[in-house]
Amino acid sequence: TSASDGVWQVGKDIDAGTYRANNSVTDRCYWEISVGDDIVQNDIPGGGYPQVTVSDGQQFKLQNCGTFTKQ
């Protein structure tokens, strides 16, 4: 399973689990995990290969991060 720019419903659009960036991200990358209108976790990593764990019922948002693939 993989995800790129957009908002993904965990358990519907993508599987729950740990996702990692396929390529090193730039300082324009932003990711966010939310439930409804509440942000659970977010980051602007600024580089490297960020890794994010998402659970069923959450939303996973990616902006300018390339593709994340389930590990």
Language-model segments: residues:
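Primarily secretory-pathway and cell-envelope proteins
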Residues: T1-S2, V25-Q71
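A glycine-anchored, Pro-Gly-centered beta-turn/N-cap motif
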Residues: S4-G6, V10, D15-T18
